[in-house]
């Protein structure tokens, strides 16, 4: 009788341990992510951050003009990184792994055409002038 009880208890313990492995991974309500987004100026910054923040579940978004990195805090229970990236490409900015449609890119302000090297160089020249004025 003791052997039967022992075997039955061992079976239950083994079964319950296996059931715990099957549980779904908990989603983080304050996940931090960062990735690269193409853009060149303050207007791009506002557009990129607004697109990210309008995504349900995004709590914080800030994009750096110099590094092109966006830092986001999101609730993974409400949204995904893929959704955020799609929303940013929908306003005309390329994200690593996703390219904005031509229609979306054409909708950005003429000074924000980050795919045009002349405009990018013009912005870089403006940044240098601003730095010299501050000194």
Regions found by a protein language model. Name each.
Residues 18-36, 82, 96-135:
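Sec-dependent signal peptide cleavage junction
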Residues 48-64:
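Short acidic amphipathic segments
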Residues 1-25:
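Bacterial Sec-dependent N-terminal signal peptides
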Residues 35-52, 110-114:
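Short, thiol/selenol-centered motifs that function as redox-active sites or metal-ligating centers
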Residues 60-106:
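Mid-chain, structured segments of secreted extracytoplasmic proteins
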Residues 23-27, 44-45, 59-62:
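Short amphipathic alpha-helical segments, especially helix-boundary/capping motifs
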């Amino acid at each position: 009788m003791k052997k039967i009880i022992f075997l039955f208890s061992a079976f239950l313990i083994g079964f319950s341990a296996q059931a715990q492995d099957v549980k779904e991974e908990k989603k983080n309500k304050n996940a931090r992510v960062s990735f690269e987004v193409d853009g060149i100026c303050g207007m791009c910054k506002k557009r990129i951050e607004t697109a990210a923040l309008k995504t349900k579940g995004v709590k914080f978004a800030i994009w750096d003009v110099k590094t092109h990195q966006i830092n986001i805090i999101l609730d993974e229970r409400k949204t995904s990184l893929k959704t955020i990236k799609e929303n940013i490409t929908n306003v005309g900015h390329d994200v690593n792994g996703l390219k904005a449609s031509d229609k979306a890119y054409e909708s950005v302000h003429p000074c924000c055409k980050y795919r045009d090297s002349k405009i990018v160089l013009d912005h870089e020249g403006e940044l240098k002038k601003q730095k010299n004025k501050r000194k």
